Amino acid sequence: SRRERTIYTPEQLEAMEEVFGVNRYPDVSMREELASRLGINESKIQVWFKNRRAKLRNLE
């Protein structure tokens, strides 16, 4: 009964990567704006940024 893995479209990934390039820690209003623009839950966006920062640390 685990939840399904979220699969993001290339457009969604591009938009999130673009924000990440400017700000690795977007605040809730920025995440909400992204969420409504991309049609994703804000919580999913929060998790994506958390994981993206972890990925960045692993690459360093």
Swiss-Prot record:
Primary subcellular site in the record, as a coarse category: nucleus
DNA-binding region (UniProt annotation): 1-60
GO cellular component: nucleus
A GO term for molecular function: DNA-binding transcription factor activity, RNA polymerase II-specific
Location relative to the cell: Nucleus
SUPFAM superfamilies in the record: Homeodomain-like
Classification via InterPro entries: HD, HD_metazoa, Homeobox_CS, Homeodomain-like_sf, HTH_motif
Pfam families named in the record: Homeodomain
Record keywords, A-Z: Developmental protein, DNA-binding, Homeobox, Nucleus
PANTHER family per the UniProt record, alphabetical: HOMEOBOX PROTEIN, HOMEOTIC PROTEIN OCELLILESS
Protein family according to the UniProt entry: Belongs to the paired homeobox family. Bicoid subfamily.
Name of the protein this chain belongs to: Homeobox protein EgHBX4
Source organism: Echinococcus granulosus (Hydatid tapeworm)
